[in-house]
């Protein structure tokens, strides 16, 4: 995060960190001759804390999707064209990604901006997270303009899908599968094991449901 060499700006670190929330490895380190880039070394630590807190809150979803991808021999992070092969705009989109079955991300990549244009191949739910709070708003299929301030992360939940999120915590030891909530309007199959053994039996699969979920 921030690049292995050089001196990344605060803005670059925050934007890169917001993208890394969804990647398997979320780590910032650097070459010996480059200045340290730990988050606490930058001013305005509250923005960094905001993004890092989202990583912890999304771990139930991310862990579940990583395991499903491994067990199904399918990529977890994919270009839009993988899931929407009949949509020419989705096939041409090279700066947005599917993360698991439920989420599409569209990171802000340009310096000095807080907005960007995104393409949504179906109606979705836009989720904005910042400083401990989630806000949700339905958005229509097609091109949209989103806004994400430094310290905020925006992502999209696919129609009929859901994302489990945990409560704020500062360590994976504090994650509690019994206190999750669902974002979105669908069902979600959660993968949750003991965190220690390699037993992946069916006993570790649970089905979370919202009231508006059929069945």
Q: Residue ranges of each PLM-predicted region?
A:
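Catalytic-domain carbohydrate-binding cleft regions of carbohydrate-active enzymes
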Residues: 1-152, 194-196, 201
